[in-house]
């Protein structure tokens, strides 16, 4: 059995004159929580359609759970939340989920139990008998998430899963996704990069139909090779650190009074060792530390790689 839940190799897909995918490559390891990041029009929705078997590639290879993305082969093994999930307005939420369970091959009692289970996952058990047409937008989104988890599939694709949710239910959904690590493979497409950084193991950046970078979130954000220290007003210790601590680079951002330290980790000198050295020198110089963090945000890393469009305002708390 392959270790990859998703493997795309030089995949192309056109819709008339629109070249949605231009040789996209993607490897998603089994059991990971994986972030798919990119602007509108990057090809993320098309990629999801290929993974589900709703679309076929014009060129290249698509392999899902060790084989071709055939909807019959993937029945019960792949669940998906489209960005705009639609429900039958005149049937109850329970009836909708039981119907989908029956389509997966469940017998009626099993489908009933699964509907009850997944509604509990998204805190909608008390609305099981309400007509879908009477639900709020956020409740419809949560039913869509429940639908994706129906039958405990091996692979789940979630397109903007927390969009439209109130803060408590968004928090609960993030916790639900994190809890599946190692049990199911979940791919999350979202514009909320701070959220993706908090829940995902690996990520891929897409732009104009290609994957421009991918890897472990800790590697992309340089968690093991970079850190920042924000200082209270006082002398700038830049030259002191450059002369006393062995690093690859030390830069000073005066407007935010932030030192950014980059280094090459070795088995005998890891991030925590370099952080301790820098803090020792800062303390000896009388500098006062306000904040400390490892790496840079996923948003910063993405913006470094992406083609500039309009000026972006960071929403993360890192200085």
Task: Tell where the protein language model's regions lie, with residue ranges.
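Short, charged/small-residue-rich alpha-helical element at the C-terminal edge
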Residues: 225-305
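Hydrophobic aliphatic residues
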Residues: 101, 177, 181, 221-224, ...
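ABC transporter nucleotide-binding domains
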Residues: 4-6, 13-24, 28-207, 212-213
């Amino acid at each position: 059995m392959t270790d990859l839940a998703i493997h795309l190799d030089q995949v192309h897909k056109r819709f008339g004159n629109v070249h949605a995918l231009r040789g996209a490559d993607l490897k998603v390891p089994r059991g990971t929580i994986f972030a798919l990041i990119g602007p509108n029009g990057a090809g993320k929705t098309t990629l999801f359609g290929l993974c589900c078997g709703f679309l076929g590639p014009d060129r290249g290879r698509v392999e899902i759970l060790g084989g071709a993305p055939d909807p019959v082969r993937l029945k019960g093994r792949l669940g998906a939340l489209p960005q705009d999930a639609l429900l039958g307005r005149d049937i109850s939420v329970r009836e909708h989920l039981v119907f989908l369970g029956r389509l997966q091959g469940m017998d009626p009692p099993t489908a009933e139990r699964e509907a009850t289970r997944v509604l509990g996952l998204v805190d909608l058990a008390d609305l099981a008998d309400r007509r879908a047409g009477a639900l709020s937008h956020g409740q419809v989104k949560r039913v869509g998430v429940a639908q994706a988890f129906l039958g405990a599939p091996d692979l789940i694709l979630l397109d903007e899963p927390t969009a439209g949710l109130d803060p408590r239910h968004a928090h609960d959904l993030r916790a639900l996704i994190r809890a599946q690590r190692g049990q199911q493979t979940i791919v999350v497409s979202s514009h909320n990069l701070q959220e993706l950084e908090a829940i995902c193991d690996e990520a891929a950046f897409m732009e104009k139909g290609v994957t421009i970078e991918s890897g472990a979130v800790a590697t992309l954000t340089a968690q093991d090779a970079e850190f920042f220290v924000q200082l209270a007003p006082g002398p700038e210790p830049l030259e002191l650190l450059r002369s006393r601590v062995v690093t690859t680079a030390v830069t000073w951002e005066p407007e935010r009074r932030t030192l950014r330290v980059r280094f090459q980790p070795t088995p005998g000198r890891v991030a925590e060792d370099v952080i301790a050295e820098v803090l020792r020198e800062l303390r000896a110089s009388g500098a006062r530390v306000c904040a400390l963090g490892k790496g840079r945000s996923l948003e910063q890393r993405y913006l470094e790689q992406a083609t500039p469009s309009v000026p972006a305002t960071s929403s993360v708390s890192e200085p």
